[in-house]
UniProtKB/Swiss-Prot annotation:
Disulfide bonds listed in the record: 254-281, 269-279, 421-490, 562-596
BP terms from Gene Ontology: O-glycan processing; protein O-linked glycosylation
Family of this protein: Belongs to the glycosyltransferase 13 family.
Catalysed reaction equations from the record: 3-O-(alpha-D-mannosyl)-L-threonyl-[protein] + UDP-N-acetyl-alpha-D-glucosamine = 3-O-(N-acetyl-beta-D-glucosaminyl-(1->2)-alpha-D-mannosyl)-L-threonyl-[protein] + UDP + H(+)
Protein name, as recorded: Protein O-linked-mannose beta-1,2-N-acetylglucosaminyltransferase 1
Positions contributing to a carbohydrate binding: 129, 179, 207
Gene3D superfamilies registered for this protein in UniProt: Spore Coat Polysaccharide Biosynthesis Protein SpsA, Chain A
Main location: Golgi
Length: 660
């Protein structure tokens, strides 16, 4: 090994140097940046290609739509039809003077668009049946009114005629039918449609579809109609497209004197339609009233709560009658609106009244119940010194002597703990069963429909246990329950001081109103002096009832009480009849008697300890339930109480009217 020498061809061995960490990081970072730039460049190129392709596709599609739009058939499906619609056309760069209007009518859906904006779309099941009407301002194109009239049901055509007659000339009218709109479309309504220039409207048949656009008092701007081929089917959907030329602002406005009242009127009339002469340019109806003051007005400082929803035309009618009543105090009136609806608040502002809106709670009848609770609580918070509150609803006419009636009777609530309320409504007070506007009764039921509530009753008893939102109860039925009423009674007049005119509501329709509300008697005589008011106190009333029964002539019980001859053809007499009533809740005979007397018969109302009081042929007619009533002692021994048996229930009988 001593003679070993390294080879000159091999490099000497040395330790390998490690690369710097900085150079390694810089190398990797350079590679990542290059990759990112590459990806970004690719993405930009991809987007450019996509944009070019889409532009070409849009141009080709518009060309195809333009060629096909003239051939659009009314029977096409709604979605297909909308897919082929042109976008709203624009004329130049200045203000537009033409509206693009599209109207769709079919069995299950209606639709209206103005310049591409949907102003009506209704496809809810079992709702919105009938003729939908929209009113546009002829100068601006904004929606001034939206209504639906269920002209399948009775009297809705009358409401439509009234509304259309209230619309000012020149306004743009749009009509469209959902489901069925002809069944109760009578000649008067058809004649009105004919006067508007419609050709198809007056000939509208069973389950036809129809769309119409025109000016009131001006030309028809478009109309389409499809007849139903058979009773079991509907007309094809129709889709109407038309241009509506706009008028000048000068033509659409009135030039009233610049007063505070007219400024309110101008704000109202520029926004909404369907209120008739209140917006007349030449002779507008007053919006301020000056009824005579009421001498010794006991209700001058009693707050009035008007319970309202989204029925502005009802509210308008109701407030006009309320503000015209003798003794009214406008500063004591508050309108409570269930929901943030604009038009009802416009009506309130028109009359210069206080309006309060709140968020709806719950659904259906529970929503109404919560609305009442919130409104009553707010009323006593607004007027903490008030002992009472008057409760009204938006669909009531108020008699001219409404406050006079309350002023003469409200002391009874303070002096008689056996009383529950004072109501302006007589459930049994029909045109043929009510006669004396000066006469008062005590009844065990709570009629509502214009009534006075004692604050102590509400705060101490009703408010703490008011039905909660999850309970779908009617507030008035709950108040009538024995647990709330606790044997107390209400004071009512023989002739009502309120009239229920509303035919659209949660528990109301045309059939129901026709049968039970339309023919109620309503006092129109001012200044009625109530008779023997203090005799309505608990003990005094018993004396009065016994006096009446002692003087009454007993009718011939062998006759049929449902026949007109049951009562003699006299006037001014008092008669009594005795009917079978085995116990306090046995109302079999009374219910059948109420049916043949054509008065309220759905449940028992208007009674006092088994006694009913009404008028027949201008005679005071008393009915006593035997033996349940304590007044049975007045029955002569020879008289057998009348018994009317309930008819057998029919199995499979017709139910309530449903969507056609």
């Amino acid at each position: 090994m001593d003679d070993w020498k390294p080879s000159p061809l091999i490099k000497p061995f040395g330790a390998r140097k490690k690369r710097s960490w900085y150079l390694t990081w810089k190398y990797k970072l350079t590679n990542q940046r290059a990759l990112r730039r590459f990806c970004q460049t690719g993405a930009v190129l991809f987007l450019l290609v996509t944009v070019i392709v889409n532009i070409k596709l849009i141009l080709d599609t518009r060309r195809a739509i333009s060629e096909a739009s003239e051939d659009l058939e009314p029977e096409q499906d709604y979605d297909e039809a909308l897919g082929r619609l042109e976008p709203p056309r624009r004329i130049g760069s200045g203000p537009r003077r033409v509206l693009d209007v599209e109207v769709y009518s079919s069995r299950s859906k209606v639709y209206v668009a103005v310049d591409g904006t949907t102003v009506l779309e209704d496809e809810a099941q079992e709702q919105g049946r009938g003729i939908h009407v929209i009113v546009l301002n002829q100068a601006t194109g904004h929606v001034m009114a939206k209504r639906v009239f269920d002209t399948y049901s009775p009297h809705e055509d009358e409401a439509m005629v009234l509304f259309l007659n209230m619309v000012a000339p020149g306004r743009v009218l749009i009509c469209t039918v959902k489901d069925e709109g002809s069944f109760h479309l009578k000649d008067t309504a058809k004649a009105l449609l004919r006067s508007l220039g419609s050709q198809a409207g007056p000939a509208l048949g069973w389950r036809d579809t129809w769309a119409f656009v025109g000016r009131k008092g001006g030309p028809v701007l478009g109309e389409k109609h499809s007849k139903s081929p058979a009773l079991s089917s509907w007309g094809d959907p129709v889709l109407l497209k038309t241009d509506v030329p706009l008028s000048s602002a000068e033509e659409a406005e009135c030039h009233w004197a610049d007063t505070e009242l007219n400024r309110r009127r101008r704000r109202f009339c520029s926004k909404v339609e369907g209120y008739g002469s209140v917006c007349s340019c030449k002779d507008p109806t007053p919006i301020e009233f000056s009824p005579d003051p009421l001498p010794d007005n006991k209700v001058l400082n009693v707050p009035v709560a008007v319970i309202a929803g989204n029925r502005p035309n009802y509210l308008y009618r109701m407030l006009r009658s309320l503000l015209s009543a003798q003794g009214v105090s406008p500063q004591m009136i508050t309108v409570f609106i269930d929901g943030y609806y604009e038009e009802p608040m416009d009506v309130v502002a028109l009359f210069g009244l206080r309006g309060i809106q709140h968020t709806p709670i719950s659904i259906k009848n529970a929503r109404v119940s919560q609305h009442y609770k919130a409104s009553l609580t707010a009323t006593f918070n607004l007027f903490p010194e008030a002992k009472f509150a008057v409760v009204l609803e938006e669909d009531l006419d108020i008699a001219v002597d409404f406050f006079s009636f309350l002023s003469q009777s409200i002391h009874l609530l303070e002096e008689d703990d056996s009383l529950y309320c004072i109501s302006a409504w007589n459930d049994q007070g029909y045109e043929h069963t009510a006669e004396d506007p000066a006469l008062l009764y005590r009844v065990e039921t709570m009629p509502g429909l214009g009534w006075v509530l004692r604050k102590s009753l509400y705060k101490e008893e009703l408010e703490p246990k008011w039905p909660t939102p999850e309970k779908l109860w009617d507030w008035d039925m709950w108040m009538r329950m024995p647990e709330q009423r606790r044997g107390r009674e209400c004071i009512i007049p023989d002739v009502s001081r309120s009239y229920h005119f509303g035919i659209v509501g949660l528990n109301m329709n045309g059939y129901f109103h026709e049968a039970y509300f339309k023919k109620h008697k309503f006092n129109t005589v001012p200044g009625v002096q109530l008779r023997n008011v203090d005799s309505l106190k608990k003990d005094a009333y018993e004396v009065e009832v016994h006096r009446l029964l002692s003087e009454a002539e007993v009718l011939d019980h062998s006759k049929n009480p449902c026949e007109d001859s049951f009562l003699p053809d006299t006037e001014g007499h008092t008669y009594v009849a005795f009917i079978r009533m085995e116990k306090d809740d046995d109302f079999t005979t009374w219910t059948q008697l109420a049916k043949c007397l054509r008065i309220w018969d759905l449940d028992v109302r208007g009674n006092h300890r088994g006694l009913w009081r009404l008028f027949r042929k201008k005679n005071h007619f008393l009915v006593v339930g035997v033996p349940a009533s304590p007044y049975s002692m007045k029955k002569p021994p020879s008289i057998t109480p009348i018994f009317l048996e309930s008819p057998p229930k029919e199995e499979g009988g017709p139910g309530a009217a449903e969507q056609t």
